[in-house]
Amino acid sequence: MTESETTSKKVNKRVKPVPKSTKAGLIFPVGRIHRMLKNKVPLKRVSILSSVYLAAILEYLASEVLELTISQVSIQSKEYHNVRRISPRHLLLAIKTDEELDNLIRVSTTIAGGGVIPYIHEVLKKVEQKPTHPQQKQTIKSI
């Protein structure tokens, strides 16, 4: 064999690199999160395990929010037929209905186009008052 044939065989035997996300069994990009963490940490020394852990947490939170949002869309599609898109309104309602996510996101986040949570204060609701005096009963009946 010539030298060029042996080097070409060595190149063909080279194993393709496997992404860190695949090794960890995640969808979120571990390598990108690792790079971003290294840019933010002053000493530039970050363990790859911390990146895997952070990617797993972010993936879990994203899946939780998406699951709750899909349930909001299905609830609204029963009221209004053929709702097939997730809107900022659905996202807001999903986050506000879950107590833990609401506590996590409440302080620093505003969802553009989300609107407000439907709520009517008890004072503003119409309540029939019972008349206390007999004269009030007569005036109400006469009207």
Curated annotation (Swiss-Prot):
UniProt key word Nucleotide-binding: no
Example of a GO cellular component annotation carried by this entry: nucleus
Domain of life of the source: Eukaryota
GO biological process: heterochromatin formation
Subcellular localization, as worded in the UniProt entry: Nucleus; Chromosome
Example of a GO MF term: protein heterodimerization activity
Pfam families listed in its UniProt record: Histone_H2A_C
PROSITE patterns xref list: HISTONE_H2A
Listed InterPro entries: Histone-fold, Histone_H2A, Histone_H2A_C, Histone_H2A_CS
Keywords, in A-Z order: Chromosome, DNA-binding, Nucleosome core, Nucleus
Gene3D superfamilies in the cross-refs: Histone, subunit A (1.10.20.10)
Protein family per UniProt: Belongs to the histone H2A family.
Assembly: The nucleosome is a histone octamer containing two molecules each of H2A, H2B, H3 and H4 assembled in one H3-H4 heterotetramer and two H2A-H2B heterodimers. The octamer wraps approximately 147 bp of DNA.
PANTHER family in the cross-refs: HISTONE H2A
Function of the protein: Core component of nucleosome which plays a central role in DNA double strand break (DSB) repair. Nucleosomes wrap and compact DNA into chromatin, limiting DNA accessibility to the cellular machineries which require DNA as a template. Histones thereby play a central role in transcription regulation, DNA repair, DNA replication and chromosomal stability. DNA accessibility is regulated via a complex set of post-translational modifications of histones, also called histone code, and nucleosome remodeling.
Protein name: Histone H2A.z
Protein source organism: Dictyostelium discoideum (Social amoeba)
